[in-house]
C-alpha cells in the first residue's frame, strides 16, 4: 500500500458519502488488511445485516498507519466534532494506550457477546496502560523458536536450556539481532525477561523505574557471549531462509510467517516450533470504536461478528495463519482437525496463555535496545 499523507487521509474521509447505513472502518496494516475487510469481512457483514454497507480505509503499514488514525482522532477532538467519521479502527497495540488516555474510545467490550471470549492479558493492558473494555483483539501475532527436529530431536523448553544448547552447537542458532525485523527483537526481550534479574511483569506493565535498567548487566554479558556463538541473520525472512537451507537448526520467527513459508513450500514441512519459558513477546492488533462514532450500534455488531468463533476460524486462522484474538479453545469447534493441528500442535492454547508475553512498555523497550547496541557486538 502506498503511504498516505495526513492531508490525503483527511480528504479520503471527507469524500466518503454519508449514509446512515454505511460503516467506516479505518485499518492500519498492509494491503491484506484492507482486502480482508473489503473482500471477506465487509461482504459477510452486509449479508448478515442486509441494507448496511462497509467501507474500509487503509492508512498504511506499520506504526505509521496507526499513527495516522491517532492523528485523525486528534484532529476531530480539536475540532470538537459531535460525530466522528470513523466507526471502527484497527490499530497496533502501542497506539491504544494514548487513545484511551485521551478519552477518544468507547468502552464497548462488555456490550458485545464475544467480549467474554477474550482471555489474554493484552486485552487488559497495552504496554503499561489499562485498556480493559476498550479493545477487542482482531488477532494475536506471536514469535517462537523454529527448529529442525532432525538436528534438534529434543528442543529446549526454556531460555536456560536454549543457551546451553547453543553453546554446545556453535553457529546452529541464528537470529537477526535487533535489525531487520522484530523476531530478533522479541528474542532479545525474552532473554531479558528470563535473565534480567528483575521483575518481568514490571517490564511488561510498568511503571518505569530507572533502577530496573541497572539490573541487566549480567544478562547482556551472557547475551553478548551467546551472540558470538550464534549466526547473525539479515532479518525475519533471513532466519527462515537459513533454516530452510539447513545453515542453522534453530532461530526465532513470527509464527504466521513460519506457517506461510511452509504452505508455500519455502520451508520443509518437518520444521517445528517451540515457545520457551518464561515466554516470548507477541502483539495483537485491536478493534477500537471512537466514543463519538456516528454508528455505534452498527459498529458493535461489526466487531462482534469479526470476533465470533466462526469468523476468527475462517478469516484469521485459515486465511492468515494468525492466532485468534479470542481464546483459541472457543475457535477449535469451527476448525477442521488438520487446520487446528497445524497451528496448535506445537504451541497449544495453554502455552500461548502462559508464555505469549507482551513487549516491554516503551521506556523499557528503548532502554533494552540501547543497552543491546552498547553491549552486544
Q: Can you name each region flagged by the protein language model?
A:
Residues 187-189, 193-270:
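Ligand-binding pocket segment of bilobal, Venus flytrap-like solute-binding proteins
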Residues 280-281, 285, 289-352:
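Mature extracytoplasmic/periplasmic domains
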Residues 16-20:
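Sec/Tat signal peptide C-region and signal peptidase I cleavage site
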Residues 26-30, 130-138, 147-149, 170-184, ...:
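Short beta-strand->loop
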Amino acid at each position: 500500500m502506498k503511504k498516505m499523507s495526513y492531508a490525503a487521509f483527511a480528504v479520503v474521509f471527507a469524500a466518503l458519502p454519508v449514509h446512515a447505513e454505511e460503516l467506516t472502518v479505518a485499518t492500519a496494516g498492509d494491503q491484506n488488511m484492507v482486502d480482508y475487510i473489503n473482500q471477506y469481512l465487509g461482504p459477510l457483514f452486509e449479508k448478515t445485516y442486509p441494507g448496511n454497507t462497509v467501507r474500509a480505509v487503509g492508512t498504511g503499514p506499520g506504526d505509521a498507519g496507526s499513527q495516522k488514525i491517532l492523528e485523525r482522532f486528534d484532529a476531530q477532538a480539536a475540532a470538537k466534532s459531535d460525530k466522528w467519521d470513523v466507526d471502527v479502527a484497527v490499530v497496533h497495540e502501542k497506539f491504544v494506550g494514548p487513545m484511551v488516555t485521551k478519552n477518544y474510545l468507547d468502552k464497548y467490550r462488555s456490550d458485545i457477546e464475544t467480549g467474554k471470549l477474550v482471555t489474554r492479558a493484552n486485552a487488559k493492558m497495552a504496554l503499561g496502560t489499562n485498556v480493559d473494555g476498550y479493545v477487542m483483539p482482531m488477532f494475536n501475532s506471536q514469535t517462537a523458536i523454529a527448529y529442525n527436529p532432525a538436528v534438534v530431536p529434543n528442543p529446549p523448553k526454556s531460555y536456560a536450556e536454549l543457551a546451553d544448547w547453543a553453546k554446545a552447537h556453535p553457529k546452529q542458532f541464528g537470529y537477526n539481532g535487533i535489525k531487520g525485523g522484530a523476531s530478533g527483537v522479541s528474542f532479545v526481550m525474552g532473554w531479558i525477561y528470563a535473565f534480567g534479574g528483575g521483575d518481568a511483569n514490571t517490564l511488561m506493565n510498568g511503571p518505569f523505574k530507572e533502577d530496573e535498567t541497572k539490573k541487566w548487566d549480567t544478562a547482556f554479558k551472557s547475551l553478548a557471549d551467546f551472540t558470538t556463538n550464534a549466526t547473525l541473520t539479515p532479518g525475519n525472512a533471513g532466519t527462515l531462509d537459513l533454516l530452510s537451507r539447513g545453515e542453522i537448526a534453530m532461530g526465532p520467527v513470527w509464527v504466521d510467517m513460519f506457517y506461510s513459508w511452509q504452505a508455500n513450500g519455502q520451508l520443509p514441512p518437518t520444521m517445528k516450533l517451540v515457545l520457551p519459558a518464561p515466554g516470548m513477546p507477541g502483539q495483537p492488533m485491536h478493534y477500537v470504536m471512537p466514543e463519538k462514532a456516528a454508528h455505534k450500534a452498527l459498529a458493535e455488531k461489526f466487531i462482534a461478528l469479526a470476533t465470533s468463533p466462526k469468523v476468527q476460524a475462517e478469516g484469521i486462522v485459515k486465511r492468515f495463519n494468525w492466532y485468534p484474538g479470542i481464546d483459541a479453545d472457543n475457535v477449535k469447534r469451527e476448525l477442521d482437525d488438520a487446520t487446528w493441528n497445524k497451528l496448535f500442535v506445537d504451541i497449544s492454547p495453554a502455552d500461548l496463555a502462559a508464555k505469549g508475553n507482551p513487549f516491554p512498555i516503551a521506556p523499557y523497550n528503548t532502554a533494552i535496545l540501547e543497552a543491546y547496541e552498547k553491549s552486544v557486538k
